[in-house]
Amino acid sequence: MAEASASSAHPFDRAIALSPNGEGTFEGRTSEDYWNFTGPFGGVTAATLLNAAMRHEKRIGTPIAMTVNYCAPVAKGAFTIAVREVRTNRSTQHWTIELAQGDAGVAATATAVFAKRRETWAHHPSKMPEAPPPETLPELPTRGLMQWMQAYAFRFAKGMPSPPRPVPADDDLGPSLSHVWIADRPARPLDFLSLMSISDSFFGRIFHVRKSLIPIGTVSMTTYIHVDADEIAEIGSDYLLGVADTNVFNKGYSDQVAELWSRSGRLVATSHQIVYFRS
């Protein structure tokens, strides 16, 4: 992907922009447009790490899987990403990626798998949940909320989060499942990088369940991509239907399982997270 440095570039492209600095090394800076509570939105960090691998001169194929481990908050300012090719096979290629900030050390690590997809037999037993078209649903107001939330349009079909209350009430828990149409704002054609970011754009499941703003942070996220470049291009800048749920909250950690569907009913990506919470 070409470096996005022009002022006319989409905010997302500016946020993930990298400059090469020697073999397998890139330099970047955090973006105010995707700021979260204590650092950049985790999705844009994941996309930036993936961008480094995609820009490597030895990269083959397209991404099919990526695991990101968030080791520490990324501070405002510059960072360095180091990318290392671990092994290249006939059809797959494996990478390790590391983001560091000077004396603060490593803030995130990742492994990524790329593949040369081929035409094969296909079967799609999983079916997209029924949901009204996004245009028929109200957009969630995000003005005044975290900057990263203002970078997306959210239209909930199920599981709209309740207004946060100051103190959680365990005798009034909400559902953990949500169905939400998600798109970049302003609109931007979907690609592997923005898909990686959107895979982390679900609100914390504990916000839905306890109806309160509780400190959380993703510790590790794995995203699997089920489409190739042509299939992503067919989606354009349209909404994706995000389906997210959890299995357990226990002793400070919870999981999140998620799916992203195109409007046409194609499963585009799935993701799994382990999330820290303080309660």
Task: Spell out what each predicted region is.
Residues 1-279:
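Terminal targeting signals and extreme-terminal segments of soluble enzymes
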